């Protein structure tokens, strides 16, 4: 037995309450190493009533198998250990490590030779409470400046014609009224949640350089325009999530300019990380977003005057400062009270966790069903314990999906291993709350990476809408928009329907409808069954079983299911078999969602 590979940690993603009535336990073991794992679990004060239950493999990655069991809780005080078996070899595994069964009195919760794992008490307030609507959410990300110009009177001076090749300086006039005017399009598409990149006053076209957190950018509209958007969206069953930038502000932020002018005498000097006074822009002597990229020696800023540099740099917030924190959380409370349904948080990794905990209390105190999503590009386990964010932008899965679907750089088996590794990092509530994406304002568009191959995009979308978490479509991907990395991925939405890929859009409509109507896709367990050149994923909720089968090769592939009748929910084709087996031929570069 490979004991070095075995791992468990209570009060973590390996042991967590799903609810007050359900408690999930996971165990990691070497891949293919164990024959059997039994969980011995019960009330730590009534240990004689303990139960022995077999654990099943929830998933496998490249190196490990992950066993799990959902325990129906009858008392919030939980004790447990594992019985591990391989051939004739047996070990007990508990908080004190490994022990031979014959040397332990298992009738005792604790003995000198062996100590059980404990989850001391399931406190309701500690349970990760995701919003009630995340499992059925179908998101659509909008970059407001490039979505629709609904009121040309709001546009900046010298606005570029709609559809101009984008760069980091030009404006095209997108605004909040434009989004409101296109809600019917979004409703028809199947969207029920919007994520808007920043809309607060800023100097750039992307608005991540906020200069006033309490005011809508005047080129986007005003508070009445936001209220109208929220109200009209809610009438259509569409929720609205705003983007909050609390890691840094714009260089033109009034309080930062006060520090530039008055130095150490400024009452706002501790709102930012100033290394020395007076403030200098060349060289930069304060912490800013990304530090180097927005320093004056960056090629994109080398010709700017000092006055321009003052606004181009994005100073980092000191969120430990009580007054700075009060200002930011006051703005958060204002917009949350206005009726938004949650927040996406920019550069979330670099902001202290104390701030995020107060942020969550502020938001949930106003709207207990609000969603909180962080921008993370790597493992975010520490932030997803239910006291900070609900989920994150799932760039780990996004990268894997691009490698498999767009590039064919990994095999189906390796792809499912990466997916399992990502899923096992987090609790079920966190996985359900992940914002899953194929592209965004910070990446090249999928169709560009795939060389314009829409069949690859359709495959990736079929995966996205049937995987665990909240599927999110970047504006225009559904009609075939392309673009390299920023700024090219931020083109204006082309509203000329004759330019759309209508077949692709219809595919997205079908997937969105299925996601919103099929409970197995919302709440079902996930199991990967890839074989050969086929990626296979099962979602099951009670008797409802849906199987996503994707052929990402240029050759037809056969897939066999048990049963004599199978229907593809995408093409609506039926397949008949015999002797309790149905063989389905999956054409090259195509996807099926099969139902028995």
Which residues make up each language-model segment?
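Glycan-association/targeting regions that enable binding to alpha-glucans and other polysaccharides
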Residues: 1-135
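Carbohydrate-binding surface patches
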Residues: 14, 24-26, 528-562
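Hydrophobic faces of well-ordered beta-strands that scaffold small-molecule active sites
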Residues: 138-140, 194-196, 240-242, 343, ...
């Amino acid at each position: 037995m490979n004991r070095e590979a075995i791992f468990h940690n209570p009060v973590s993603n390996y042991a967590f309450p799903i609810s007050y009535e359900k408690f999930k336990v996971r165990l990691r073991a070497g891949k293919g190493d164990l024959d059997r794992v039994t969980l011995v679990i019960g009330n730590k004060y009534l240990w004689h009533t303990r139960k022995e239950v077999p654990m099943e493999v929830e998933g496998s990655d490249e190196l490990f198998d992950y066993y799990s069991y959902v325990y129906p809780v009858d008392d919030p005080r939980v004790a447990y250990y594992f019985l591990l078996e391989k051939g004739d070899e047996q070990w007990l595994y508990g908080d004190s490590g490994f022990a031979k069964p014959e040397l332990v009195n298992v009738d005792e919760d604790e003995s000198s030779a062996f100590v059980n794992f404990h989850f001391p008490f399931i406190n309701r307030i500690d349970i990760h409470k995701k919003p009630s609507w995340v499992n059925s959410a179908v998101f659509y990300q909008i970059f407001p400046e490039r979505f629709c110009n609904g009121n040309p009177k709001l546009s900046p001076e010298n606005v570029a014609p709609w559809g101009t090749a984008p760069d980091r300086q030009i404006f095209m006039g997108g605004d909040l009224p434009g989004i409101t005017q296109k809600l019917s399009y979004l409703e028809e598409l199947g969207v029920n949640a919007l994520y808007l990149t920043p809309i607060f006053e800023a100097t750039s076209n992307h608005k991540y350089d906020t200069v006033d957190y309490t005011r809508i950018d005047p080129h986007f509209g005003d508070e009445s325009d936001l209220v109208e958007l929220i109200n009209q969206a809610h009438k259509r069953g569409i929720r609205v999530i705003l983007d909050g930038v609390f890691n840094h502000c714009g260089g033109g932020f009034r309080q930062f300019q006060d520090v530039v002018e008055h130095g150490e005498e400024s009452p706002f000097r501790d709102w930012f990380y100033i290394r020395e006074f007076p403030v200098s822009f060349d060289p930069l002597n304060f912490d800013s977003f990304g530090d180097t990229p927005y320093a004056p020696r960056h090629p994109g800023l080398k010709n700017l005057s000092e006055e321009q540099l003052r606004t181009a740099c994005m100073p980092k917030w000191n969120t430990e400062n009580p007054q700075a924190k009060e200002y930011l959380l006051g703005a958060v409370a204002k917009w949350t009270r206005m009726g938004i349904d949650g927040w996406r948080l920019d550069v979330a990794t670099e902001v202290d966790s104390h701030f995020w905990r107060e942020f969550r209390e502020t938001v949930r105190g106003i709207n207990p069903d609000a969603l909180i999503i962080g921008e993370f590009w790597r493992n975010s386990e520490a932030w997803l314990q239910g006291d900070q964010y609900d989920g994150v932008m799932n760039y780990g899965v996004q990268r894997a999906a691009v490698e498999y679907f767009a590039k064919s750089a990994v095999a189906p088996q390796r792809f499912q291993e990466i997916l399992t590794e990502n899923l096992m990092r987090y609790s079920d509530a966190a996985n359900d709350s992940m914002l899953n994406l194929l592209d965004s304002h910070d990446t090249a568009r999928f169709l560009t990476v795939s060389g314009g191959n829409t069949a690859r995009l359709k495959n990736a979308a079929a995966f996205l809408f049937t995987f665990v978490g909240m599927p999110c479509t970047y504006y225009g991907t559904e009609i075939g928009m392309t673009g390299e990395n920023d700024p090219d991925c931020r083109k204006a939405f082309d509203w000329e329907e004759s330019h759309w890929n209508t077949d692709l859009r219809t595919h997205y409509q079908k997937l969105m409808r299925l996601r919103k109507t099929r409970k197995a896709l919302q709440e079902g367990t996930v199991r990967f069954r890839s074989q050969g050149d086929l990626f296979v994923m099962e979602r099951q909720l009670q008797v409802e079983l849906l199987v996503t089968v994707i052929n990402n090769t240029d050759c037809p592939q056969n897939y066999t299911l048990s049963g004599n009748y199978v229907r593809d929910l995408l093409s609506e084709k039926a397949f008949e078999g015999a002797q309790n087996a149905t063989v389905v031929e999956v054409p090259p570069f195509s996807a099926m969602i099969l139902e028995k």
